[in-house]
Amino acid sequence: MSSVLRLLGRRICNPAAEKVRLSSSLSGGGDFPILNGHKAAQDLSKDTLKSQDITKEKEGQHKEVKKEFKIYRWNPDKPNSKPFLQSFFVDLSSCGPMVLDVLQKIKAEDDASLSYRRSCREGICGSCSMNIDGTNTVACLKPINPNTSKPTIITPLPHMYVIKDLVVDLTNFYQQYKSMEPWLKTRKPPKDGREHRQSPKDRKKLDGLYECILCACCTTSCPSYWWNPEEFPGPAALLQAYRWISDSRDEYREERLQAITESETKVYRCRAIKNCTATCPKGLNPASAILKMKSKHLLSDPLVRTESV
């Protein structure tokens, strides 16, 4: 088993079987039922299949398919050195289909000092968020662009303090998320020690809200957050605010709405640019959630309380 495969923690799989698994994701079936209804994720699956087909075709014509990747580098141990883009040439015929596969191959074979975050490799943890060819996304879900005539440029999430290379400081992002109090708040426990029950209809209202993986792609693509990171919570935090405002089990929904609308630096700092929705790797729509909270506040729409099931 090669050093790359050891780093990836997996064995060589059957290419034909892998293609069948990816094909099943286009309809949300097979091994990927969670992709059903997520257009952005299904588009990524289509791009991956296309990338694999093109790479396989080129592999049959040439022994190697070299592509250039320009990666942002900066070492805090050398504070007098300016950041720069370092070029790496990777053979796509011996690499996985995603950008994260490229980074792991580079770290294993070319430069062990390359720093980046990664964990699940399944688009669940949000660790490997970065900017790839000008778009914030997670590297494990971003297919490699098979066009070898131009390089792929990989940089850290924009307008964030860089710790090293592709690793950024997310402290403020998590603090803004925490300020939304993302947990169930009730005035009294349910009778007889039961769990807080919820009807299927009320549970359906949370779809498209709870799936956030806190990758910070949306927040770091928002100009309002760029210029006011200490005051404006950002799209990810506001999406979570709406998630709990929409939860029928929560008994502080009015207070939550008041907390984010009493100051112009909160929900009203959003200018509806919608970069957040365009860049979300999970296909969520923070801009819509923010608009709905504005509407609830401006129209004085009372939040309907529901009875326990």
Swiss-Prot record:
Pfam families for the chain: Fer2_3, Fer4_17
Nucleotide-binding listed as a keyword: no
4Fe-4S ferredoxin-type domain mapped to chain residues: 202-232
Molecular function (Gene Ontology), one example: metal ion binding
Domain 2Fe-2S ferredoxin-type: 69-160
Keywords: 2Fe-2S, 3Fe-4S, 4Fe-4S, Electron transport, Iron, Iron-sulfur, Membrane, Metal-binding, Mitochondrion, Mitochondrion inner membrane, Oxidoreductase, Transit peptide, Transport, Tricarboxylic acid cycle
Cellular localisation: Mitochondrion inner membrane
Top-level class of the enzyme under EC nomenclature: oxidoreductase
Binding site residues for [4Fe-4S] cluster: C212, C215, C218, C280
Protein name stated in the entry: Succinate dehydrogenase [ubiquinone] iron-sulfur subunit 3, mitochondrial
Organism: Arabidopsis thaliana (Mouse-ear cress)
Lineage: Eukaryota, Viridiplantae, Streptophyta, Embryophyta, Tracheophyta
Encoding gene per record: SDH2-3
